[in-house]
Amino acid sequence: MLDAQTIATVKATIPLLVETGPKLTAHFYDRMFTHNPELKEIFNMSNQRNGDQREALFNAIAAYASNIENLPALLPAVEKIAQKHTSFQIKPEQYNIVGEHLLATLDEMFSPGQEVLDAWGKAYGVLANVFINREAEIYNENASKAGGWEGTRDFRIVAKTPRSALITSFELEPVDGGAVAEYRPGQYLGVWLKPEGFPHQEIRQYSLTRKPDGKGYRIAVKREEGGQVSNWLHNHANVGDVVKLVAPAGDFFMAVADDTPVTLISAGVGQTPMLAMLDTLAKAGHTAQVNWFHAAENGDVHAFADEVKELGQSLPRFTAHTWYRQPSEADRAKGQFDSEGLMDLSKLEGAFSDPTMQFYLCGPVGFMQFAAKQLVDLGVKQENIHYECFGPHKVL
């Protein structure tokens, strides 16, 4: 526990943090990667270049300082970050490195004096221990469950299937022939790659796209413009190739009773965790209402349409609606979509009027903000809306 003086000293730095903004974390990362370049093998350097990770870390630091007297308020954020850390295989000793550079950054940017540095050192130590302990629990859970493992495990690509002009699915089975750990629908795999020509090891998280079967995993990858890893997977990864995986993780997952109605809302590749949820509901014979609402640019980039239709047919109460923002003439001729333009949930209000319905969202942040606002305006309770950001977390 932190003493009152330490808490007061940390809280007194909040105005300075707010004034500085993400420039603080930019300095921190630049310093850390200069002095500890080995950490480039762990961090997603693409998120460093576009500034997303720097913004996410700044928001986390500011939230900690603001809630330092009420740590339980931070537990949802801690869980999200700890789950992600396990896919990077973060170790306790790496927290010492981060702490060293955080304090040095505060000193170099603000020269706040030893009292402030000591207070932040104590505060960081408390938070680091929270993460270390929770991550140890997750590592132990992953290693001890049936089919689980520690660290990375070699998996072979056994199928590679284009699903649209931009999305390709990969089916993976363990090289050792053993069973694989189950997961909750909505969670992701940590994929570790360092192909020839890559300057650093790259680690990515890809959502699992079907119900666990104990034998292998399926992910789907969108080709991102300029994306080093996604383009390598699309262009160079082949059936028979071996990749390293970390056990499934993630705090975004569906856990509902059979009589709980569910709405799955997605855009683009955001449908991937929803597929695992839909597959799970279909194979469980879910009896309550299930809605599938999806937005795509057009038919060329609309993946898994046939699979969704087939899964929906096995559910007794299923409604699907697809929006194409800019459908082609071929799309119109085929009748592959229901509405043109942006997703408008007000026209489907009757499909989710049950106050117990749970809503799961995934897609670009702007889309999720747009969809979540519509739901709230239609009377949906905020606590019934669950969402996942691909990349560093953002608040809707």
Curated annotation (Swiss-Prot):
Region ranges (Reductase): 147-396
InterPro entries per record: Cbr1-like_FAD-bd_dom, FAD-bd_FR_type, FNR_nucleotide-bd, Globin, Globin-like_sf, Globin/Proto, Hmp, OxRdtase_FAD/NAD-bd
Positions of FAD binding: 188, 204-207, 389-392
Segments forming a coiled coil: none
Organism: Escherichia coli O157:H7
Protein's name in the database: Flavohemoprotein
E.C. code: 1.14.12.17
Residue sites binding NADP(+) per the record: 268-273
Residues the UniProt record annotates as site (Involved in heme-bound ligand stabilization and O-O bond activation): 29
Function: Is involved in NO detoxification in an aerobic process, termed nitric oxide dioxygenase (NOD) reaction that utilizes O(2) and NAD(P)H to convert NO to nitrate, which protects the bacterium from various noxious nitrogen compounds. Therefore, plays a central role in the inducible response to nitrosative stress.
Needed cofactors: heme b; FAD
